[in-house]
Structures are given as structure tokens and as C-alpha cells.
Amino acid sequence: MAEGFFSRGFSGRRRRADDARLPPGQYEEAGFPVLSAGPTPRTPLEEWDFSVLGEVDAPTRWTWEEFRALPSEEITKDIHCVTKWSKFATRWEGVPVDTLLEGVETSAGYVTAYCDGDYTTNLPLEDLTGGRAWVAFAYEGEPLAPEHGGPARLLVPHLYFWKSGKWVRGLQLTAHDIPGFWESLGYHGYGDPWREQRYWGD
């Protein structure tokens, strides 16, 4: 799937010129397209866990039951895929990354989100804090389906959606920025949709 997915020639549909919610080069999508780099992992909840590790004073790990017992938030956000579709007012429920990092002491400036299926993506730590990111477990009032990243996915709606890693299992805090899966194949290191940061050099 990676060969077909990575293409500068993807043109998408015509952008509604009067819609200020659409970043440059995007079109509004009513559905929720499924794009993945490989087969959909299906991890039983009794085997699922989530960890914060790396450049931290002490690693932290939660089982599914412990994770679901953490305070969660309902959020409504627009999302923007690098393949040029945007979906407005998507409703999620998830645990704020701020909650997962509460009490963590670190000098790290970056994070690698690692996921089932050997997927990773890299982000500045500041883009996951300050109420800007969640680990989401529900979408539109229902448990998050595996094809959309369930049982839990990272949700970083202010960046292109590949940064919201599906099937997330942990956050590794690092001193240096380490390119993730798509970033190593030519996607932009940051991925701001309003600056059209899709690929290297954008």
C-alpha cells in the first residue's frame, strides 16, 4: 500500500473556495476514508497496554482497564489527511496526553509515538501538551473501530492526520527528533496542514 499511497500526484477533489475551515489544497469529505500502511492489527484488550518511556525519570505503564479509568474528555475537531481530504466536526473521546504525562520529569523535546503494526511517527513534545492531543478510544459515541485505529489511537488534530498514529501503544520521549515510518519515506517531519507541509521540502 505504501507505494500507491506516497504520491505527489494525488490531486483529490476541487476545494470549496469559500470555506475558511479547509487548509490549502484540501477538500471536504463526508465519509471517513481508511488508509493504512499494512494490515489492521487486532490486539485483544486483555493484552493491550500503553507506556510512557524514554527520557523520563521513571517509565509508566497502564493496562486497558487502568487506562480507561483515567479522566477522559469529549472533543470535536476537524481532521485533515495528507491525501487532501478533510472531515469537519469529528467527535472523539480520549485521555489527554497531558494526563498521561502528569508528574513525568523529562528534558526531552521530542516524542516518538509507537504503534502496533510497527508504525511510528515523530512529534515535538510541545505539540502533544497544552490540551492539543489525546489518546482516543471512542469515535462518534462508539468504541473506536480497528480500521480507524482502535482500540486507541493518538489524536493530534492540528497536524496532518498521519501524525495521529493508529493502534498507538506508547510514547517514547527523546532528546532528538527521530523520523517515523512515513517521515523516513519522504513525508514532512512536522506536517502542518495550513502550511501544506506534506513532503520533504514543503
Question: Model-found features: residue ranges?
Answer:
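Structured, non-membrane catalytic/scaffold regions adjacent to prosthetic-group chemistry
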Residues: A2-D202
